[in-house]
Each structure stands twice: as structure tokens, then as C-alpha cells.
């Protein structure tokens, strides 16, 4: 993986939870010199595990991660057992930000008072629906690189199995049924279920102040609506509102 630094500041990339040589771990000043502006660094390793993983800056983390330098990686097993097969495979990155009134850039100095909570860099109603057919077997991969908050992710209308953590896929005997799964900061969780009921079903964090930030309240059901329409309507009330991302 070639990483070219187009920032005005040094950076690195850390491959979170991945088994790799020490020199490829991406911690600036410890396992490698930071990548200077304009430079390219090659990260190289042999993939020895499958699962859901994340990557993020590991240099001036408070600033660079708070500005969105993060993402997800999925390593599929070379030989997939039957129980691994799904019809729909989704990935959602959970994050949080501080956006002051009248601004469009997150405040990287905030430590606890976050007011925008996002799923894959968007907050409701700018989030994309997870579309599936009745009877589909669905996997949702959840990763949390929020600065300070865990998220208890709840699915309406169905129960699911927790099938994997950032330590890898769980043996069938260790998987458990749930309707809500806690995704701690720096962790991943895979959940799997059968789409057994028709309809638009919410998927949200169940911490109430997180729910109020992005899910459902006082608005029509916008699971499959065009993002621009509700955004314009909300701006009539809150002039500085924007669907993040």
C-alpha cells in the first residue's frame, strides 16, 4: 500500500488490529519516521488473518483523526466456509465530531462535547439506506473510531448474531443472539441476520443523546428519501444544518 502525503503536515497510517511487521505498524516516531508532506511511504505485509479492520492516522491523532483520517478494511478468507456466505455485506464506520455554529470544519480541540454523530461520515438524514430483499442473509460490519464514545447499536424488528470482533470471527459455539451490540471505541463487531420482515427498520445507537442527534425524531421516515430534500427543509429552521459528508 503506497501512502502519499498531500497534507501540509507529517502523517502516518496505522493498520488497526492487523498482524504485520513492527516497521509497518505506522506509529510516527516509534516504528517509522513520519511521512513528510510530498513524500510517499510503502506499507507492505503478508495478510495472515481475515475479518473487519480499520486504519487511521497515528501522528497528531487528536487533529488528524478528528478531521476524518480513518477508514475500514475487509480481509475475506481465501476459502470461505458455508456459514460465511451472505447475500448483502455492509460496513459502517461510527464517528463523532464537534461542529460549531456557522462552521463546516470539525473542531479538533474538543474532548467531550460532540454534537455531530455519524455513520460512515454522514448523519441522519444524510445516511444511506441498507437495502436488502426479504429472506436475504445480511452482514453488517461496525467499526468505531469515535474520539470518546462507545455506541450501543440497535436494530429494530429483527434479532441478529454477533459473529465477529476485531479479534476475528467467533466460533459458532461462541456467537450469541442480540438486538443491541456495544461497539467500544477502537473496536469492530460483525452482526448477521436474516431479513425476515418487510419494511423500513431503523438501525441506530441506543444512547438517547446519540439517537436525538441523528435518528427519526420530528421528521418523516427518510430511510430512502433523497438527501437534499430534507436538508433544505431543516435549514429553514436551522440555517447552519448540513448532512455531514
Label the model's feature ranges.
Residues 1-245:
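Copper-binding active sites and cupredoxin-like electron-transfer domains
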Amino acid at each position: 500500500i503506497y501512502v502519499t502525503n498531500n497534507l501540509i503536515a507529517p502523517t502516518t497510517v496505522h493498520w488497526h488490529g492487523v498482524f504485520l511487521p513492527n516497521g509497518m505498524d505506522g506509529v510516527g516516531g516509534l516504528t517509522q519516521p513520519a511521512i513528510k508532506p510530498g513524500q510517499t511511504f510503502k506499507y507492505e505485509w503478508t495478510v495472515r488473518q481475515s475479518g473487519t479492520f480499520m486504519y487511521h492516522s497515528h501522528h497528531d491523532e487528536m487533529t488528524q483523526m478528528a478531521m476524518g483520517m480513518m477508514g475500514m478494511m475487509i480481509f475475506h478468507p481465501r476459502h470461505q466456509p458455508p456459514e460465511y456466505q451472505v447475500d448483502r455485506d455492509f460496513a459502517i464506520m461510527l464517528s463523532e465530531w464537534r461542529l460549531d455554529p456557522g462552521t463546516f470544519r470539525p473542531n479538533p480541540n474538543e474532548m467531550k462535547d460532540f454534537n455531530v454523530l455519524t455513520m460512515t461520515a454522514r448523519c441522519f438524514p444524510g445516511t444511506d439506506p441498507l437495502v436488502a430483499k426479504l429472506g436475504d442473509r445480511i452482514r453488517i460490519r461496525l467499526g468505531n473510531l469515535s474520539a470518546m464514545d462507545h455506541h450501543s447499536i440497535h436494530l429494530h424488528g429483527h434479532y441478529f448474531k454477533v459473529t465477529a470482533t476485531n479479534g476475528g470471527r467467533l466460533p459458532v459455539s461462541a456467537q450469541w443472539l442480540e438486538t443491541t451490540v456495544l461497539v467500544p471505541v477502537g473496536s469492530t463487531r460483525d452482526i448477521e441476520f436474516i431479513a425476515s420482515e418487510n419494511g423500513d427498520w431503523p438501525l441506530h445507537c441506543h444512547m438517547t443523546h446519540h439517537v436525538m442527534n441523528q435518528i427519526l425524531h420530528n421528521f418523516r421516515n427518510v430511510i430512502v428519501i433523497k438527501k437534499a430534500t430534507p436538508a433544505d427543509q431543516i435549514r429553514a429552521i436551522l440555517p447552519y444544518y448540513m448532512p455531514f459528508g
